[in-house]
Each structure stands twice: as structure tokens, then as C-alpha cells.
């Protein structure tokens, strides 16, 4: 007699890949809820994001690829994990006790979270036996993500734009346009070697991809020393260095590029015109015609900040298609009066000045060009005059007013000739982004030009407006939308409270509503270190603590 068919579950329920992190986030959420703090919402969002993530995490740093995980929360997880292991914990956050395939080594031997962790490939994985070809797009993607993983100052992920930019430096033939599909990226996603999260997508290595990338790096002789990075060293809480809002870190491209040195006879001064200045209806724009008439050597490019910059271009380069270029320490932003009026109304005026201050160049020129009658504009003449005056007196820009486009072109021609004379006979050298340079030239006026300059690629890459931003940077931009809150004031607030969550926690710790209103009033701002003041402090309190619609 045949045995009866036994119906049952064919697949076991999936085991939680990160039980410790889930448990700790749940505890923190419940504790915040019991105290009535707003941080419970932060922990709840992070918990949901973690529960949807199917792969194991070996440190809090790795959790940064997930949504709602900021620097502070990742540090909290790492500190909690360190305490757990120090108290005799017998497994990592991604290896629940009793789970098959748990690490067999002694519990005391815990690898550094910033170093590659080799894992066994899963059964049935499509990545088993896969080895990307030399100079292929897939190989370069894995290596670039591996470098980012080793970078202690990085995020352990890259966006598609960042991947395209970095891979184009090594294998330009296999890199498509930014709007086109990338077969190599799709193949790695299909093989479960990389993981895509967020929108726009962020790509990071999976454990299988990390193991393969480590083998590729060893095959190419790439190590943490050759990559220009060092593994993260854990020295307790003192190792956490707060980020500065106005001091962007050194880019990977700046680390990898060989130093560029241009001797006096090896370069020429060239004016770079933003492509936005060249748009015309069926004819070449007047600005380019005037520059050609004045015989100003120039080129048209996409500039992410400013309208005109000058570069020292190599005259006898090794690669004629890619000559070395160093950006001289001057930048010009051109505004017609009608454009100035509209930019003040829609908020671009303050944002553009803030980005110009952070572009890495010390001498900033604001070129204001007359256009038609002032009485036909949306703002009164006194408002425009006040804005221009503030730009010179408060922001420290050099303001130049011209009558028309011909006079503007003539001024650019004079600047070009002046820079040629200024740098004549000087040897120019490249410097990485963030190294001392422009700040020194501003602090100590001198007749000698700044000869330690940014490369054009570094300058333009760091000036990208819509690049991936940290919570700190987005918080600062949000603060700057408040009327009366300048970039310097926003930076001062963010230096004290780096995220909205930390600000809300500070509000929760206040005993009375009056104390909450005055919480930010004594924050020191700007070079004169003046207080933020009660009015702005009250406005920010109403913005972040009001449960009803703002009036």
C-alpha cells in the first residue's frame, strides 16, 4: 500500500540575516517611544529598511547603503556591536546562532569591518566560476566599488554617474552614455555580485561580489596601499572625526592622478566659457563673436559652477586628446539685470553665491551687466543695488558692472591678458581637492599668483550640483530655504546639530517651550561670531516642532 502523500512547506521561512541589528533598533525605537521622542520615527524607518534587506551585514558601516541609515546611526550600531563582542557575544550581527554556515573560528577573532570579508558562494549562485575579462566594464565596476569599500572616508557605495566617471578614466571604450543602459552593470546585478538601492540608484558590493573583487584586485596587484586608501582603524570613540560642511574631502580621482607640473614654456592661458553662454537662436551668440573679434583664446565647455574660468593648458601633452589643465585661481559669474532679478526671486541668487564660495577658487568676480530699463523689472532698483552691494561687502566678491555685452567681453579680454602676465614665468603644480591653496590666497593678499592649482577635472567634478549628498548637506540646504538664514548661519547650525534627528532630540531634551524657542539663539555665526538670534531660533523651532500647518 502506497504511503499517503504528505503535504508540507517545501521551503523553510527565511532566517533574519541581521538579527542583532534588528533587535537593537527595536530596543532603541521602543525606548524613544516610551520617552515621547521623535527619534522613534528615525529608528522605525531604519528598522523597516533593514528588514527588507536580504543580505547579511557585518558592521554598522556596511548598513550605510540602506535607506534611513545615517552616519550617527551606523556609529551607534558599531559601538553596540563592539560592546556585544567585548561582553562575550559569540556571533557577528549577520550570523545568528544555530544558523548553518556560521563562521567556525573562535569568537575573539573578529575581522575589521573595513577589510574584505571572504564568504562562500551560495548554492546555485550564478556567480560561481565567473571571472570578468581584462579591461571589461564588469571588471572595472567591481574594482571601483572595491576601492570605495576600502576607502575609510567613503560611503561603500557609488551612484551610476560616479561609476561612469571613474570607469571612463580606465576603460573609456566600454562606458556608455549616462542615459543609456549599461549591460555590464545589469549583468553584475543579475549575478548577485552588486546590489542597487535607493532612487537614484546606489550600487554596492554583495558578499559574493566583495570576494570576487578582492581576487581581481590581488590578480592585478592592487592593494590598499596602491589604491591610495588605508583600512579604517578603530581606536574607540575618539576616532570619529566630525565632517566640515564647507570642506569637501579629497576625491578618489585626485588621489589616483599623477601630480601635474607645468613649467613656464609648457602651457598657455585659455578662457573657458560655459556652454550656457553660447546658446543662440540660429546664429552664434554675440559673446563668442566679441571674444573672437578681440582674439581671446577660448573654448566652450560645460561648467558646473560659474560662467567663465581660466585654465593653464599643456602645450605639448603626452596625450594630444587629453592635455593636462590646471584651473587658475579666478572665476566669473555673469548676470544680466533681468536674470539677477529673477534669481533673487526664485532663490538661485543665494545658492549660486554659496556654491561659488565652495568651488575651490579664491578670486570670485560677479559681473553685473545692464539690460534694458531698470523700471521694467519685477524688483525695484534699490533692491538690486542692495543685493549687489551685499555681494561685494558681505560675501567678499569683486563686483564689476558693465553697460552691455561688448563691454563684458572687453573686460574678459583684459582679465585674460592680465592673467597671462601674472602667471608668466611661474611653474604651476597640481594639488588635490581640499589641500591648502585658495584659502591661503584669500587670507594673504600678494602680488605673487597662486601656483598650487586644481586640475580642471577635479574642479568640475566637485562642482556638480546634483551629486550624491549626505544627510548633513541636505539638512544645510533645507535650512538655507528659511528667509534670513544664510550659508554661514546654516553651517553654524549644522556644526552644532549635524542632522534633523539630532536637532529634534535636542528639542525633546528641553524642559519648556520657551527653552525650545531659544535653543539656537546663542549659536555663533560667521567671521564676527555673532549670535544667531531669537527671531531665527523661534522660526526654526516653529518649523521643526509645530504639529499644525505653519501660518
Swiss-Prot record:
Residues 84-131, 229-259 are annotated as: Disordered. The keyword Metal-binding applies. Residues 92-107 have a biased composition (Low complexity). One of its GO terms (cellular component) is endodeoxyribonuclease complex. Residues 124-244 are annotated as: Interaction with BLM. Disulfide bonds: none annotated. Expressed highly in testis. Expressed also in bone marrow, brain, thymus and to a lesser extent in heart and skeletal muscle, colon, kidney and spleen. Residues 131-230 are annotated as: Winged helix domain (WHD). It holds the Pfam family ERCC4. GO terms for biological process: DNA catabolic process; DNA recombination; DNA repair; double-strand break repair; osteoblast proliferation; replication fork processing; response to intra-S DNA damage checkpoint signaling. Mg(2+) 1 binds at residues 274, 277, 307, 333. Residues 110-131 have a biased composition (Polar residues). It is found in: Nucleus, Nucleolus. Catalytic subunit of two functionally distinct, structure-specific, heterodimeric DNA endonucleases MUS81-EME1 and MUS81-EME2 that are involved in the maintenance of genome stability. Both endonucleases have essentially the same substrate specificity though MUS81-EME2 is more active than its MUS81-EME1 counterpart. Both cleave 3'-flaps and nicked Holliday junctions, and exhibit limited endonuclease activity with 5' flaps and nicked double-stranded DNAs. MUS81-EME2 which is active during the replication of DNA is more specifically involved in replication fork processing. Belongs to the XPF family. Part of the heterodimeric DNA structure-specific endonuclease complex MUS81-EME1. Part of the heterodimeric DNA structure-specific endonuclease complex MUS81-EME2. Interacts with BLM; may stimulate the endonuclease activity of MUS81. Interacts with SLX4/BTBD12; this interaction is direct and links the MUS81-EME1 complex to SLX4, which may coordinate the action of the structure-specific endonuclease during DNA repair. Interacts with DCLRE1B/Apollo. Interacts with RECQL5; this interaction stimulates mitotic DNA synthesis. Interacts with CHEK2. This is Structure-specific endonuclease subunit MUS81. It comes from Mus musculus (Mouse).
